[in-house]
Structure formats: structure tokens, C-alpha cells
Amino acid sequence: SYVRDNNGSITYAELSYLEERGVKAAAVSNPAGKYVLPSPTTSAVWLDAAEIAADGLVTQNFAAKAADAYPINAVSYGLSSTAKSATNASVKSFFAYFLDVCAPKNAAGAGYTPLTGSILAKADAQVAKINVG
């Protein structure tokens, strides 16, 4: 990759891409004034302060002062209709499995952050809105 092969280059990429390509990440200063490297753990600390609106959009709290929080994170969304539907049972089951079983076991090993704590509870509350009919 260009960044790996050109000393001093800067880019933004998912942690999994950096790990796959052997590219070093920079420690970033967070609102607590501490320089923190990206990891599933430091991202989880940051995301725990995020809010989820009624429509499911995540707002990161850029004033959160957790000392071990890495402040540069992207959020992936699972999208579904919440309207009553018999087929929503499978969709709801998939999202619940992904958040509560698959991600905790596999996300960190793939360079991603499983949701934990209050942000996981908020995500589970969004899944609960899927009306299975």
C-alpha cells in the first residue's frame, strides 16, 4: 500500500486494514488529553458514551473525557423496516445474534469493535423496535 511504502504518509483506514498490511497506527489525543492507540478496547470505551437517536442514528460524544478512549471511530449500521411483517422475525433474530453472540466472539479478532455496555443496550433497544407481527 502507498502508506506502508512511503514513510510519513497519512491516511484514515479501518484498524483491520492496518493490521492486515502491517501499517502502524498513530496515537491520537482524546478529550481527556491522553494519546491513545486504536484498538477494539479503546474504541469500545469511546463508543460507550455515544447516543442513539429514536431513528437509530448514532451521535458520538466528542466531549467525553474517558482517559482510555480512542476518539476516531466509524459506526456501521444494520438497516431494517420496523413495520409489522412476518419476515421481520428472521431480520430481528439476525441482528440480535450479530450484536449479542457473533460480534463479542469475533469482532476484535477481525480488527473491529464489538459493542459493550450502554451502547450495546441502546443497540439492542433498536433491534427490539423491529415488529415481527
Go through each PLM region and give its residues.
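Extracellular/periplasmic juxtamembrane helices and adjacent flexible linkers that interface
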Residues: 62-133
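Ligand-binding pocket segment of bilobal, Venus flytrap-like solute-binding proteins
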Residues: 1-50
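Phosphate-binding glycine-rich loops and adjacent basic patches that engage nucleotide phosphates
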Residues: 39-41, 52-62, 84-90
